[in-house]
């Protein structure tokens, strides 16, 4: 079974740097697309930027 070694290398190649870069790029694209679809800018502004309302008694 000398041919099985070559077959396994074709099925399970080593992970290359470009594969990691491509996965990161697709992740960024997916996150940007999700933010574009949801557009939570009002919630982000209300939650993180505007000061909390003060209670006056």
Curated annotation (Swiss-Prot):
The chain crosses the membrane at residues 24-44. GO terms for cellular component: cytosol; mitochondrial inner membrane; mitochondrion. Its main location: mitochondrion. It comes from the Eukaryota. The keyword Phosphoprotein does not apply. Coiled coil: none annotated. It is a single-pass membrane protein. It is found in: Mitochondrion inner membrane. Keywords: Membrane, Mitochondrion, Mitochondrion inner membrane, Transmembrane, Transmembrane helix. Residues 45-57 are mitochondrial intermembrane. Residues 1-23 are mitochondrial matrix. Belongs to the UQCR11/QCR10 family. Component of the ubiquinol-cytochrome c oxidoreductase, a multisubunit transmembrane complex that is part of the mitochondrial electron transport chain which drives oxidative phosphorylation. Component of the ubiquinol-cytochrome c oxidoreductase (cytochrome b-c1 complex, complex III, CIII), a multisubunit enzyme composed of 10 subunits. The complex is composed of 3 respiratory subunits cytochrome b (MT-CYB), cytochrome c1 (CYC1-1 or CYC1-2) and Rieske protein (UCR1-1 or UCR1-2), 2 core protein subunits MPPalpha1 (or MPPalpha2) and MPPB, and 5 low-molecular weight protein subunits QCR7-1 (or QCR7-2), UCRQ-1 (or UCRQ-2), QCR9, UCRY and probably QCR6-1 (or QCR6-2). This is Cytochrome b-c1 complex subunit 10, mitochondrial.
């Amino acid at each position: 079974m000398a041919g099985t070694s070559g077959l396994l290398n074709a099925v399970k190649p080593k992970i290359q740097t470009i594969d990691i870069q491509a996965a990161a790029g697709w992740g960024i694209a997916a996150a940007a697309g999700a933010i574009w679809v949801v557009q939570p800018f009002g919630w982000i502004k209300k939650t993180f930027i505007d000061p909390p309302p003060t209670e006056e008694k």
